[in-house]
From Swiss-Prot:
Keywords, sorted A to Z: Ribonucleoprotein, Ribosomal protein, RNA-binding, rRNA-binding, tRNA-binding
Assembly description: Part of the 50S ribosomal subunit.
One MF annotation (Gene Ontology) recorded for this entry: rRNA binding
Biological role: Binds 23S rRNA and is also seen to make contacts with the A and possibly P site tRNAs.
Keyword Ribosomal protein: yes
Name recorded for this polypeptide: Large ribosomal subunit protein uL16
The encoding gene: rplP
Highest taxon of the lineage: Bacteria
Length: 137
């Protein structure tokens, strides 16, 4: 699973996801992509599950690019522990996704295969997404 090799601080504020994506809104690598429509935190496990669904459907044909990286540590307190006594330990890593962000790109497959594969990947994610295609020049 994806996670940073090292970070400056162990814990972060929860934060809010405001506005739309500034960068990463265009297809840069592949012919087809999956674009986020709503803001949400996506965990490293969800990204990995979507990647597996993509590659499994494509049957090792084509190429996949993951355009998001989980760099936000999400902390949680153990179950049945009373409130207080400090913030919990980092539990998992997440990526803050803004609307308009390209999450996955694929290339080297047909339009039908790409659409089906990205639909399967989208089912593994907690956000609404849209299938996008590079406009032929």
């Amino acid at each position: 699973m994806l996670q940073p090799k090292r970070t400056k601080f162990r814990k972060q504020f929860k934060g809010r996801i405001h506005g739309v994506a500034k960068g990463g809104t265009e297809l840069n690598f592949g012919e087809f992509g999956l674009k986020a429509v709503e803001p949400e935190r996506v965990t490293a496990r969800q990204i990995e599950a979507a990647r597996r669904a993509l590659t499994r459907h494509m049957k090792r044909a084509g190429r996949v690019w993951i355009r998001v990286f989980p760099d936000v540590p999400v902390s949680a307190k153990p179950t049945e522990v009373r409130m207080g006594k400090g913030k919990g330990a980092p539990e998992y890593w997440a990526a803050r996704i803004k609307p308009g962000r390209i999450m996955f790109e694929i290339d080297g497959v047909s339009v039908e295969t790409a659409r089906e594969a990205l639909t399967l990947a989208a089912a593994k994610l907690p956000i609404k997404t849209r299938f996008i295609q590079r406009i032929a020049e």
